[in-house]
Amino acid sequence: MNNFGWVNMNLIKRVGCIAVIGSSLLICFLGVRMNAEQRRQQKIDYAEITIRNEAEKITFLDKQLSKLYKDETDEFLAESIEEVQIKQLESKINQLKTEASDFGLKSEHLPLDISQLSKDKQVLLSKVADIKTKYTIQQQLQEMLVQAPENWESTSDAVIINENATVENLLKLHNDVVQFNSLWSNSISAFLNEMNVQVKLYNEIEQGIDKMIDGQALTSEATLETFIHHFNLVTQVKNTTLRKGLSERLE
């Protein structure tokens, strides 16, 4: 009987320990689950507030992007635009939270429908990409001109190439511009065409002079007729520095 009682006591102790451990595990599990629920609810509350704020941000950023265009047609860029403005707006647009993953949640846990916000963000990204591409092309074109155009909407006699203008550079820009089909691309193409005419004229004169001169001696190509022809062509070169260089070679 004593042995039997001793066994029963041990069994009771073991069962008690198991019960205590089980209770502790259950409490821990419930605590972890409760904490997880609380954290998720905090994320949901944060998402609800943020989503409403993001909608206001999108409206504000859209207005800021519109200011980088000359007018409401969103075609030509404003004259005072700077690269830093584009980068700052692009950064702010990329920071917009418009996906469930931005809040560490699944779509079904979002308190509000943000599908429209996602679409609006993509519209902003497309607009800033348009602005950035146009700005880059205009800057590259400007680097090949003596003076930046006062008006990108139409060419004028003020369009004068510098030494950076080459057939290759102009062709590369042309290939970038033709991807657009707009008033802006038509205008930029007109600039490129005028610049291309000037580059080809300069190349024609330079190549002609090269044929007439071999070191310090004249070649058989150096006739009075070819000299007069190239001299007349030189007068058509708009860039005074380039024109002077060609004239000195003909002297």
Go through the PLM ranges and name each one.
Residues 2-251:
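Amphipathic alpha-helical assembly segments used for oligomerization, scaffolding, or translocation
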